[in-house]
Amino acid sequence: MLGEDVNFQLEWVSIYTFQCRRMEKFRHNRVVFAGDSAHQVSPCGARGANSGLQDADNLVWKLKLVIDGKAPPALLDSYDSERVYGADENILNSSRSTDFITPKSQQSRIFRDAVLDLSEHFAFARPLVNSGRLSLPCTYDGSVLNSADALPQGPARTRPGAPCPDVALENGYLLPQLGNDFVLLCINTPAPEALQVNGIALRPLALSCDPETNTALAQRYLGDAPAAVYLLRPDQHVAARWPSYNETDICAALLRATAQG
């Protein structure tokens, strides 16, 4: 690092250690654990602080609905199941990064060294260099709050459970317009003026999309479908989606997304 001709003296040396672990459960009756109190990972990929924020995003809207009497306490159980799933994903990716950086076996070291040697000269090997893949929001596949995917032509990246990707629109960006409400995103299909289920308001947001002029919106939310309707949670994860507006299906999905269906 300093060069072979530079004289230096070590003043202090320490061994850096960390742990990748989590609690068995994040909810214990009226006590809820989040952030480092619930799970710990290595610093690779900035997964510690980011996962703590994701815990808060997941918990706060559920807690508010329960406190306001608009959802049963069982909704908080989904915080446990979803964020345990997210913690396991972070621990897996964090462990893979640290195992690449500090191999635990001779075979792993041979693989790591070969990847580093090849990546210097060949582009195909560079994605294999695992120096800490950056943290990404978790897709809650299999969540009890998800409804069955009714948009088979839609993109996989916005399936139920997935975080909403941002898109540039004529008047700004999509995510700031979603806010922290339940939102019914209607693309190339009529939207209702307003809808309320068991005291929970559902705010409609209608967008038109020409795939020729807004390819990002089309690729991320339409796929091969000409139109789409998305039910979006307050933490901006997809709860359900359909090819067109159907009030009965939407009300049922909203009840399911609040542990009432």
Language-model regions: role of each:
Residues M1-R47, N93:
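FAD/FMN-dependent oxidoreductases across multiple families
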Residues M1-V6, L59, L65-P73:
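Secondary-structure transition/capping motifs at alpha-helix termini
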Residues T17, R21, A46-S51, K70, ...:
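Alpha-helix capping and helix-loop boundary segments enriched in small/acidic/polar residues
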Residues R27, A49-S51, T248-D249:
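Glycine-rich, phosphate-binding/catalytic loops in enzymes
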Residues A38, A49-K64:
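Functional cores that coordinate and move charged inorganic groups
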Residues C44-N50, D57, L76, G86-N90:
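Catalytic cores of eukaryotic secretory-pathway lumenal/extracellular enzymes that build
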Residues I67-G261:
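Helical substrate-recognition/capping region of FAD-dependent monooxygenase/halogenase enzymes
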